[in-house]
Curated annotation (Swiss-Prot):
Gene for this chain: RpS6
Annotated segments matching region Disordered: 200-253
Bias type Basic and acidic residues, positions: 226-247
GO biological process: ribosomal small subunit biogenesis; translation
Gene3D superfamilies named in the record: 1.20.5.2650
PROSITE patterns linked to this entry: RIBOSOMAL_S6E (PS00578)
Protein name: Small ribosomal subunit protein eS6
GO molecular function, one term: structural constituent of ribosome
InterPro entries, sorted: Ribosomal_eS6 (IPR001377), Ribosomal_eS6-like (IPR014401), Ribosomal_eS6_CS (IPR018282)
Function: Component of the 40S small ribosomal subunit. Plays an important role in controlling cell growth and proliferation through the selective translation of particular classes of mRNA. Part of the small subunit (SSU) processome, first precursor of the small eukaryotic ribosomal subunit.
Annotated source species: Spodoptera frugiperda (Fall armyworm)
GO terms for cellular component: cytoplasm; nucleolus; ribosome; small-subunit processome
Keyword Glycoprotein: no
Amino acid sequence: MKLNVSFPATGCQKLFEVVDEHKLRIFYEKRMGAEVEADQLGDEWKGYVLRIAGGNDKQGFPMKQGVLTNSRVRLLMSKGHSCYRPRRDGERKRKSVRGCIVDANLSVLALVIVRKGEQEIPGLTDGNVPRRLGPKRASKIRKLFNLSKEDDVRRYVVKRLLPAKEGKENAKPRYKAPKIQRLVTPVVLQRRRHRLALKKKRLAKRKQSENDYAKLLAQRKKESKVRRQEELKRRRSASMRDSKSSDKSAPQK
């Protein structure tokens, strides 16, 4: 079995191939997320504590957190599940995944160093791989450099030196910096005030329209009521005229 060990403190990772089955027994029947003391792997691993992060079996199927078995299962997955990337909106698919319990059928086991031991491991703990990209969000930059809200974040952006072009080695060095997101500037505040002003304007216009409509509706109801009363009055007077004329035309005995 191969052990893919990473050390977040240095940013390094290294692949170790372990042939001896007895050394690997410390990982068997352990779940993903469990922390294991790695003294049994060899003298150089004395004092190290490793966390099981995942793995793949010999057919390439990945381990999935929360599936409490050491065999392979087929699960119906949708957007948001690990081990699955939907190709269309709302797509669901039944995929084969391995359970989160480690056994001998795995080909690669992913491990993370939680606690460093006594000795250095060449290529893993002795080197340092700097991050290629710095933080992009303003609050993350403030957190990284311990800045207050009054400090200017733009001065602390992590820039990356671009390689010089052929024939322009003596030119001025060029840097590439990310565009800071969620940065509060006077322009942003102005836009925010403009949006609030538009919102208030729309609200006032809507209230005015509602009031105008209510007035028009009341006027229409009043006009309809007056017309109905006039119609009833006209009918009543017409019926009274008809009754009087019928009384006059009736023969007297």
